[in-house]
Amino acid sequence: GPLGNANITAKWDEEIEGISVEGRIVDLYRVPDALTGREKNITGITTVNGWISPARNDIQINVGTHNTNASFIHGFLGGIFKEVNGYVTGPISIIGPLNDVNIVGDAVPHMNLRLRATNVPYHIEGDTLHLRPYLFDFKDISIYDRFGHRSTLNGQVTHRNMKNFKYDFHVNLHELLAYDEHEFNSDKFLATVFANGTLTVSGSDGHPLYVNANVTPTKGSVFAYDAATPDAITGNSFIEFRDRDSLQTFHSDIK
């Protein structure tokens, strides 16, 4: 993603057999508020200092982010989140070798993310995202839905040379908006679901995402099923309603 207007100096360095770089990037952009949807002005400042040595097959670029546009993160998380916007603050480094690049550091995100599997937007802020070799670690990250309900996200994104991303996320839901479909979909139902329970999402680039939910709907949840269309009447075997007691018996039979 764009980082802004850059003023960067690059020069040949005999000692490292490569190019040393130093500079500053300033970006003026707008970010929607997660609760109100109103856009606000953000000034992002990013500093870079380091070197690139093709002769040594190595790189070391230290990057200082301060309200830096988070759209660049979408390239790493695009397989699981369809939208990423906001900003990040904290020191990170791009390190080599050049044929096995990593991004390491600790960044505090203030980001809006839309989960690809459910199309529900969430917001994270204030916690620290740990970037480690071959790993982006989301540990005890507070996430919020657009109503301000809070839950906890844990997960990891792994990669090789900033490619072949794999995702594994686990969310402990506490009255969080877990599903929000306002028009009848191909399965002839729509729903707004606030839930308690657990949600896991896993997958990898170029492959389907797998979603496993063990949840209980809470206050405010709505479910509507269109049984009026001919194909719904003949093809509604995908849904079965049970009372609470029979559901408990059903689960107890699972080995």
Where do the model's predicted regions map?
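Membrane-proximal interfacial segments on either side of biological membranes
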Residues: 1-137, 154-255
